[in-house]
Swiss-Prot record:
Transmembrane segments: 135-155, 197-217, 234-254, 261-281
Induction, as annotated: Induced by L-sorbose and repressed by D-glucose.
Annotated organism of origin: Lacticaseibacillus casei
Coiled-coil segments on the chain, per record: none
Domain of life: Bacteria
Protein name from the UniProt record: PTS system sorbose-specific EIID component
Intracellular or extracellular location(s): Cell membrane
Membrane-topology annotation of the record: Multi-pass membrane protein
Example of a GO cellular component annotation carried by this entry: plasma membrane
Length: 282
């Protein structure tokens, strides 16, 4: 079964199902050879080994192909599947005698790695990971052992799905994938991920950020029962979570002004301790 050729647009290729699976496994070590000179270049080269061995019979052709993929490469690891798939199709076409040179192959890699990273970074690191981490942490805070399991399983399910189906899509569509990606699809995905991420983070601000100002504004006694109205009561009636939102926006503003996150953390500790000592915060 593993040695059966993959069907691509009803045409047989030299790439087998076993080659495809090996490539998928290698994809999961994208960060293993990370370096600041060529980022993921060596890992991408390893990803291409099953294909290169399959389509090139001569040793010198295999060596040249491997060297071809040692150039700079950088994209979101979860999104490398389509790029690897397209490159596999290009390498097979070159081995079959198609007029595909080194520049063409590298141009496709460079042309895809930027846009896919533009989608993958906000999708994986800016949206999916914070949301799943927040859900897992919420369960963990309640004493449930399902919290870390939920995060690990859900995150990796999405990551592996993107790698596997992205690899299949890239290989099966080949050059047509590039045309699809050059439209508004990436922009729409990015915008959707951004809106969803902002929506979820807005919910988490009110859930996790607690600011209580217990300053007494008034005391009223009716039928022997005293009602104390604090500044926090008034703010909650006006807009629940207003202080938490304002504090969060202030921190975001300071971060954009290049204020050190470490400095902000210590400032938060200081404001909390001093505010509690003065009776302003609770």
């Amino acid at each position: 079964m593993a040695d059966q050729p993959v069907q691509v647009n009803k045409l047989k290729t030299k790439i087998t199902k076993g080659d495809m699976f090996k490539t998928f496994v290698f994809e999961n070590f994208q960060q293993a050879s990370f370096n600041f000179e060529r980022i993921h270049a060596l890992a991408f080269c390893v990803d291409m080994i099953p294909t290169i061995k399959r389509v090139y019979s001569k040793k010198e052709d295999q060596v040249a192909a491997l060297k071809r993929h040692l150039v700079f490469f950088n994209t979101t690891p979860a999104m490398c599947g389509p790029i690897v798939g397209v490159t596999m199709a290009l390498e097979e076409g070159r081995a079959a005698g198609e007029p595909i040179d080194d520049g063409t192959i590298n141009s496709f890699k460079v042309g895809l790695m930027g846009p896919l990273a533009g989608v993958g970074d906000p999708l994986m690191w800016g949206t999916l990971r914070p949301i799943l981490a927040a859900l897992g942490a919420s369960l963990a805070l309640q004493g449930s052992w399902l919290g870390p399991i939920l995060f690990f399983v859900a995150f990796n399910a999405v990551r592996l799905s993107l790698k596997w189906y992205g690899l299949q899509l890239g290989f099966s569509r080949g050059l047509a994938l590039v045309k699809d990606m050059s439209g508004n699809l990436l922009q729409k995905i990015t915008e959707g991920a951004t809106v969803l991420g902002l929506f979820i983070m807005g919910i988490l601000v009110t859930k996790w950020t607690t600011i209580n100002v217990p300053l007494v504004v008034s005391k009223t006694t009716v039928n022997g029962k005293t009602t104390v109205t604090t500044l926090q009561n008034i703010l909650d009636q006006f807009c629940p979570g207003l202080l938490a939102l304002g504090w969060t926006l202030l921190c975001m503003y300071l971060l954009r002004k290049k204020v050190s996150p470490i400095l902000l953390i210590f400032a938060l500790f200081g404001v909390g301790i001093v505010g509690y000592w003065l009776g302003i915060l609770k």
